[in-house]
Regions:
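A structural signal for short, well-ordered beta-strand segments and their strand-loop junctions
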Residues: 7-8, 43-45, 115-117, 148
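C-terminal end-helix/capping segment
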Residues: 124-145
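Short, C-terminally biased terminal segments at protein or domain edges
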Residues: 141-155
């Protein structure tokens, strides 16, 4: 049986080091344990790496880089950017949050099974999920299921 392909946006590795929200921190850590145990085929994109490299806290940045080191990194292709722009044009994601649109687009273009996020403002939202599915269907793309880590781990 093939492993599920998962895409992690930047919130997931970030929560591994966020002790202010212990339940989410525990779930993010557990997800990374599952990844290390190779229960999933785990991906991030070059957009996630860029966000990590732009972290202001150097110690945190170094920890994040180390954490995602073994994950496969997807290229943010022109097709990904085009689909992200479509989400923005249709007011699904605000322009100032283009990286959020890129995360969703990469998961769609690369036919990922699950996009895992704690971004409740722009990604893990019924309105976003429904609108992304509609646009992807219209344009012939498969939609990744957008979920939180708790949905794929044993809590």
């Amino acid at each position: 049986m093939r492993k599920l392909k998962i895409y992690l946006d930047t919130t997931i590795p970030s929560y591994v080091f966020n002790s202010h929200v212990p339940d989410k921190q525990m779930a993010a850590k557990k997800l990374f344990e599952h990844i290390v145990q190779e229960r999933f085929e785990a991906y991030i994109s070059a957009a996630v790496m860029r966000e990590i490299l732009n972290a202001k806290n150097k110690a945190l940045r170094d920890e994040l880089i180390l954490l995602v080191k073994g994950l496969k990194v997807l290229e943010v292709s022109s097709e990904c950017i085009g689909l992200a722009e479509e989400y923005i044009k249709r007011d699904i994601i605000p322009r100032e949050n283009i990286d959020d649109a890129i995360h969703i687009a990469c998961a769609s273009i690369y036919e990922i099974d699950f996009l895992i996020s704690y971004n409740f403002e722009h990604i893990v939202k019924i309105k976003t999920i429904d609108n992304v599915q509609a646009v992807n269907l219209l344009l012939g793309y498969r939609s990744a299921r957008i979920i939180v880590p708790e949905e794929v781990i044993d809590v």
